[in-house]
Amino acid sequence: MAQISLTFPDGNARSYDAGVTPAQVAADISTSLAKKAISATVDGKHWDLQWPIATDAQIAIHTMADEAQANELVRHDLAHIMARAVQEIWPATKVTIGPVIENGWYYDFDRAEPFTPEDLGLIEKKMKEIINKREPVTTEVWERTRAIEFYKANNEPYKVELIEAIPGTEPIRMYWHGHWQDLCRGPHLQHTGQVPGDAFKLMSIAGAYWRGDSNRPMLQRIYGVAFTGKEKLKAHLHMLEEAAKRDHRKLGREMDLFHMQEEAPGQIFWHPNGWTIYTTLQDYMRRQQRRGGYVEVNTPQVVDRKLWEASGHWEKYQENMFIVEVDEEHAREKAVNALKPMNCPCHVQIFNQGLKSYRDLPLRMAEFGSCNRYEPSGALHGIMRVRGFTQDDGHIFCAEDQIESETAEFIDFLSMIYKDLGFEKFSVKFSDRPDTRAGSDAVWDKAEAALLSATRAAGIEPELNPGEGAFYGPKLEFVLTDAIGRDWQCGTHQVDFVLPERLDATYIGADGAKHRPVMLHRATLGSFERFIGILIEEHAGKLPFWLAPRQVVVASITSEADDYVREVVAELCAAGVRAEADTRNEKINYKVREHSVGKVPVILAVGHREVEERTVSVRRLGEKQTSVQSLADVTIELGRAATPPDLL
């Protein structure tokens, strides 16, 4: 039999018969590894222990200590185990798909009766029984006809449809544990007993259309979470509890910030308190952008399809655009327009007005651009995922040799903004050239080197995402980690070689000839709406004082203090503090409790003593103790706290 060479991570190589499996390789290394092995990586691909290896390859054997691979396999196996459990309890249930998702998995079922929360406990119990059986997981490749006939005989029409959609060149792979099987690409664990039975939990039930098509059957989706150990599951569930307390939708109601309603799906009704946060943040960003050398512009909301066709968005993005057709007077045909989903083509139009010289570069253009994108109703989520939003959008038109310096400046700019908003640390993902791309390798080499060099010069080692760049250029993504460990991708910095060419942007170089500028798409916050949602959840509603919509409430203890309350409010407002009076005929404890729920940072209580001494009793949000300060001192202190950080 032909021999192949397998090279291990330490550089050592061994010879094996062609067709050897990773399980056999693990057994050749040691009995202990053979028992602990869960999967392999072969030439960069995640590989089942049962799959044969036909040619020379790089190989790594994985155990449960390799968390990325272990999590994927555990969650994948649990999807199968859950589907089996459901069919063992309710045999008439039809199965569809069950992919791994972040922190867990889901599986979609076609069942006549709705699942209930109580059913989740029954399913979990059955799943643990299956795990405890420690049944081997086996796999076979079947001929397409055999697989289709098998599922037809078992009344599984969704599996038949899936098989019929698989390209003819791909194998039809089946997986078993015990009597139960599923159509699956794999890989999977060696046996069900490798799944930690105390490290998973079924979380919720939801509806989902088959293939995401509202014209197809409505299915029932069960979500689960899983990890490689009990403590990790416990930590995750604690994080979810904390996240529920911080949910911006809940806090938005308590703080009277905004609401959504069915007549305007994915659109936000900002209340005065919420709009105060929005405008305060926007004013701060406007000042910082001006200091950063940006010129602010504003572009149309409704733009003819001809521009979107020229930019390429009509072809690639039309399904996410809101189309507007108008019968214009005397026009031979309808005018077809679209609400802009992004600002970049419009910014190129401004750049193209008038002749540009190399001396004009870099030209940094910014817009608080209102955009509209169609998002499926099931994807909408509070103010985090909406259809109408405003980007802190910017485009830098520059020469190729300015990419690195502009990237470095943007990273400094972004770091300052995040620090001011309470995020001291962030990580960066770097996505380089995909297989299909525009531009020469030489230009890509230069752009990729520039982004990497600028990032490392800022003391940041980016996480590499090979091949994940856009076809028109490499990109950086800036990821914030919040107080409970969740990651939020906010800022972006994207090199674009294509749009300037498609929209014929040029400048006159030092040689007197026309040149194409490079376009750098950049955003710091992303969308204002989503970032405000992140801020609310990061701070659990206790926003930095300068951003809080209601900074101070001055509450009377007795009606005889009402005039002094109004005087205190006037003093604070004159010092730049957002202060309001509460002179209602309610007990002071009731007032304090109500305003604390509304996340007012400072409550000043005023009674007879405070009137006589011209003081206030200061209660800060989250603190039980109060202190007494003079009106003059508290006005100076709170006036300074209310000042945005860039104005201190």
From Swiss-Prot:
Any one GO CC term of the record: cytoplasm
Entry superkingdom: Bacteria
Domain TGS intervals: 1-63
GO BP annotation list: threonyl-tRNA aminoacylation
Positions with a binding annotation for Zn(2+): 344, 395, 521
Alphabetical UniProt keywords: Aminoacyl-tRNA synthetase, ATP-binding, Cytoplasm, Ligase, Metal-binding, Nucleotide-binding, Protein biosynthesis, RNA-binding, tRNA-binding, Zinc
E.C. no: 6.1.1.3
Pfam families membership: HGTP_anticodon, TGS, tRNA-synt_2b, tRNA_SAD
Main location: cytoplasm
Record text on cofactor binding: Binds 1 zinc ion per subunit.
InterPro entries assigned: aa-tRNA-synt_IIb, aa-tRNA-synth_II, aa-tRNA-synth_II/BPL/LPL, Anticodon-bd, Anticodon-bd_dom_sf, Beta-grasp_dom_sf, TGS, TGS-like
Compartment list: Cytoplasm
Region (Catalytic): 247-544
Assembly description: Homodimer.
Cited function: Catalyzes the attachment of threonine to tRNA(Thr) in a two-step reaction: L-threonine is first activated by ATP to form Thr-AMP and then transferred to the acceptor end of tRNA(Thr). Also edits incorrectly charged L-seryl-tRNA(Thr).
Family matches, as NCBIfam families: thrS
Protein name listed in UniProt: Threonine--tRNA ligase
Source species taxonomy: Bacteria, Pseudomonadati, Pseudomonadota, Alphaproteobacteria, Rhodobacterales
Protein encoded by which gene: thrS
